[in-house]
Amino acid sequence: MKRKTKVTMNDIARAAGVSQATVSLVLNQSRNIKLSDDTRQRVINVATELGYDRLPAVHAPRNQEEIALLVSSMQSFDPFIDAISQAREAAWRNETLLTVYDYGDDIELALNIIRQLEKRNCIGIVLASPVTTLVDMTAFQDCTRIPLVLLNQRDPGSPLLPSFIPDDYANAFQVTKHLIACGATRIAHITGESWMEASRQRLAGYQAALQQAGLACDDDLVRQTNWQFSESFTATTSLLELAERPDAIFCASDWLAIGCYQALAVNGVRIPQDMLLAGYDDQKISEQLTPPLTSIQLPYSELGRLAVEYLCNQEDAATHVTLAGRLKVRASSLV
């Protein structure tokens, strides 16, 4: 007898003509992202027609165990959406409902949500950020007896609070080492705002790889931006104006890399013949650029799954999981 093929969210997305992120948001019953009622209903109808067996009830049973995922902000195009998708899948595998709340970086709202969760059969809370960062959990101390873990953020002052984050240091080291292996000796780095833990760790990983290879860490080759295309364009232009140009550029995000592509094109610099280029976080658009962009795929899917499984298994030991991503080598860094 032929085994029935499992219906995935990718299958639903293709049939409904929407993204997997949209399917995830609809099936999670998230109301904090502006989706039309028609889109929501189309996704539910397609999921039903395909035989998707994990459709949540509109009203969960009173005794249904749930895990709440509170995220400081959520944008459907962000790779972090993969963490939410896999967290939901892990919850369902453990016969638990995952509910998602976007608290808009409003601590008072987050605390109010947690107080409401105390009245329900909530077995765990995942406090998440779409941006890898350090967080001060002082405001959340003693606010609940519900087990709580951090996803994509950590609090150095709370060593007993479990956290699950990507290893930005190791990832940046991996990208820079790849560019060096491809023959680059003057590698520039276009990064984000210095207050962000992600920016600091990526810069540190980049510098460590240079030092290991015996290459100088030249401050003139580092450009700080606020993550905007226009600033990346300006930063790249200024690098090209140096007396000794870089032969490779490592951008701390794929969005920064887009501004870099534009500046290089305007100045007649070819990728990769004249300049090797690599990005970070493996946005969907990275494969569509010309040439396709080498980037780091962040392990958000696994981190989201591990955070939920930790709560479902009711583990007591403090856990701090840091996972490296996967280098996706494409034509932008290959001569």
Which stretches of residues belong to each language-model region?
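Short beta-strand segments enriched in small/hydrophobic residues
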Residues: T22-L25, A60-Q75, H178, R186-G192
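Hinge/beta->alpha junction and helix N-cap segments in small-molecule ligand-binding domains
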Residues: V71-D82, V100-L109, S163-Q174, I190-A235, ...
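N-terminal helix-turn-helix/winged-helix DNA-binding helices
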Residues: K2-T8, A47-P79, N94
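Append "Primarily bacterial transcriptional regulators
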Residues: I12-R14, V43, M275, L327
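Short acidic capping loops at alpha-helix termini that bridge into adjacent secondary structure
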Residues: R186, C217-L221, I271-L276
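Short coil turns linking two alpha-helices in DNA-binding domains
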Residues: S19-S24, S36
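Flexible loop/turn connectors
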Residues: F233-V335
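Flexible loop/hinge segments that line or gate small-molecule binding clefts
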Residues: L127-Q174, W255, D281-L293
